[in-house]
A protein has these predicted regions:
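A generic structural signal for nonpolar/aromatic side chains embedded in well-ordered alpha-helices
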Residues: 20-21, 66-67, 117
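Anion-coordinating catalytic cores for phosphoryl-, nucleotidyl-, and glycosidic chemistry
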Residues: 9, 18, 53, 62-65, ...
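Active-site-adjacent structural patch at catalytic or cofactor/ligand-binding sites
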Residues: 57-59, 69-82, 91-102
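Short Pro/Gly-enriched beta-strand edge/turn motifs at strand-loop
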Residues: 11-12, 23-28, 125-128
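Beta-strand secondary-structure signal
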Residues: 28, 54, 74, 98, ...
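Short beta-strand segments
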Residues: 23-59, 75
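Charged, gly/pro-rich active-site loop segments
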Residues: 2-8, 83-163
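Extreme N-terminal tail/first-helix region
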Residues: 1-22
């Protein structure tokens, strides 16, 4: 795979990429079947120990159909640092990743994944988990796990070149 052309913008450290994955409010995940691309935006939780991303979803639908046929995905987590007014530049930090999606069946793994997502997204995760996570909710919800195989990062924290 071709590397980043602007080396000064490359994120080299794994921990910095993980930080972006955990700080981002959502991810975009691209998938493809029969040469037709499909892109979705997802709430997520990143599990550092397993180097994976969890997302929740319905148990049926277009995304599920595509992923059952081709479970390889490309995704992005983006931290938008804003447009640099008058400089024709945008400040950001982003991580792109490739991985494979597995839909979880084991209730214990699904519950753990839900807790990872709740801790990533909620201000009061313990309260929300106690109210929302039950054997019934775990059974009802679909949970996907993206096992990350490759990550790359890029950032623009200051205007380097103005038009």
């Amino acid at each position: 795979m071709r590397g980043i052309r602007r080396r000064e913008k490359a994120i080299e450290g794994h921990e910095e990429m993980v930080s972006i994955l955990t700080e981002a409010k959502y991810i975009m995940m691209a998938m493809c079947v029969d040469n037709e691309p499909y892109l979705v935006t997802l709430s997520h939780g990143y599990d550092r120990e397993k180097n994976c991303i969890y997302f929740h979803c319905a148990k049926e639908g277009k995304k599920i159909d595509i992923l059952r046929e081709n479970n390889t995905v490309w995704g992005q987590a983006l931290l938008d640092r804003g447009y640099a007014e008058g400089e024709c530049d945008h400040l950001f930090a982003t991580v792109h990743f490739r991985g494979t999606v597995t839909f979880l069946e084991d209730p214990q793994e699904k519950e753990q994944a839900l807790r990872v997502m709740i801790h990533a997204l909620e201000r009061n995760p313990e309260k929300v988990a106690s109210e929302q996570v039950s054997p019934e909710s775990v059974e009802r919800v679909g949970i996907g796990r993206i096992d990350i195989e490759y990550m790359t990062g890029k950032k623009s924290e200051e205007v380097i070149i103005s038009v």
